[in-house]
Amino acid sequence: MSERENIQIAKKQIAALNARNIDEYLSRVDESCREGMRKSLDILFAALPDVRLEIEQIRAGENFVVVHSTIKGTHKGNFAGIAATNKPVNFHACNFVELRNGKAIRMRGYADKATLFEQLGVVSPGWA
């Protein structure tokens, strides 16, 4: 697929996630990855039920898309063993998605956990 088409796929994915339209989101994920992705989304929504992603930058190639985003939400559920703090969070993430026939076949994400953990009060400010 073209770079433009892959960028549109990623934008639709993020819009579906922000709208909590999980079926729409998963429709663009290869069947072999859907169950794992559904579990990941369940964990995310349990921890940050009001989570929203905002695209900062997006780049694509013939079979991939990379999205740098800001993730915002309120920590209202367990996350990585951290009980709900009810604190707002605002941190950056970058996701690399490999695509085949318009569907995600592999996803890797990296988040600014130092900032996230500071905001949750798990670590002292400036520790990293």
Residue ranges, per PLM feature:
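C-terminal and inter-domain tail/linker signature
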Residues: 1-128
